[in-house]
From Swiss-Prot:
GO terms for cellular component: membrane; virion membrane. Its main location: virion. Residues 271-337 have a biased composition (Pro residues). It is a multi-pass membrane protein. Keywords: Membrane, Transmembrane, Transmembrane helix, Virion. It comes from the Viruses. Signal peptide: none annotated. The chain crosses the membrane at residues 355-372, 385-403. The keyword Secreted does not apply. Residues 265-337 are annotated as: Disordered. It is found in: Virion membrane. Belongs to the IIV-6 337L family. This is Putative membrane protein 047R.
Amino acid sequence: MSSIVNGFSIQKSTKTAYDTQQPCDCWDCSAFTAVVGCGQTDGMDDWEFGETACCFTCPNKKQCAKPDPAECNIGTDSHQRDPLTRVTWNGRGPNVQCVYDVNRINTLEQIDNFKQRFGVHGDYNAVVANYCQQSSDSCITDPETGTKMTKCSRFKSDQKDGELCRGWFNQQPKAVQDTVVQNYCAVNNTPDCKCVNRAQNEVYRELKIGKVINDGCWFTPCANPQSYLLTTEVENPTCPSNFCDIIYNIIKDRDVTIDDVKNDINCVFKPDPPPQPKPQPPPDPPKPPPDPPKPDPPPPPPPKPTPPPDPPKPKPDPVPPPKPTPPPPKPTPPPPIPPQPVPILPIPPVDLKKNWIMLTFVGLVLALVIYPKSRHAIGTHTWRNAAIAVLVGLNAFGLQSYVNNHV
């Protein structure tokens, strides 16, 4: 890729205007004064942006400007270097052409400034392509180690430069994508280039089986587009259903240890079962001991004389059976106790030594007061009835006193 990129725009600044040295003041010019044109830059006429009216009949003086480098400023790179190498006209002014060293455009700010000044046409694509083919220190996780890659392409960066480059990359034709990743990995053998640079991998060279099985089926870096850069030849491959069996047989045939290659193989192999121990032959049965020699039979003992039989012994007298013990006599129950007569409690007589007569008298007096007819009689004959009541009360009191004393 060429290291030169261009940006094209229309100059608006007149800060670079200069004097054409044409006389214009009175007494210095006349109608016959020659008109002086604008100068040139790189063989192209400078920008004539206007005229200045001169004295009386003198011809007007042209206003000219050189290309302004400020119209091309996109900022310095990460090493504080200005990428602008030359400013000239694009045919003629005010069409300006800015020439840059693309290798000094390596910051997001420069990319944004270039886009704002010149748009996404022209060499913007080349600027982004060169920027994205540079390496980054902010990387995604390497699935092989479980830690972040120490260095990677900007396509695998986890910062904003990664977002920019992935967006640009996905908009490119497949042929351009292949060229970009191959150019990057040819210069930078970073961990995300394990698929593109797989020919440098010892495990790949050990197990490569020609073109029978696509590398995107069995070689792990080529089967993981999220972590590694891929070319179109290994993307979305058609894989045979038994490709893991084929790889397993190749590993066995080439006497390769599975543990040494399992991280690079896109298959899950079960560990080999431990070797079965060889059966031990059964021990020889013990030999039976030899039969001992049979001893000579002992001589038979001489016959003994038969003793005479014992005389019969007299039989003992029979023992009489024991007499049964009579049962003990039953206890005599005590005679029954006759019931005792319960004395009849006498009903106590009514005690007449009370004020019964007086109470009766008081009750009669109250009855006379309570009943309406009695109140009427009392109200009509008050004094007479009061006298009668006093006499009756005295008689009742006397009768009660007699009863209490003599009865």
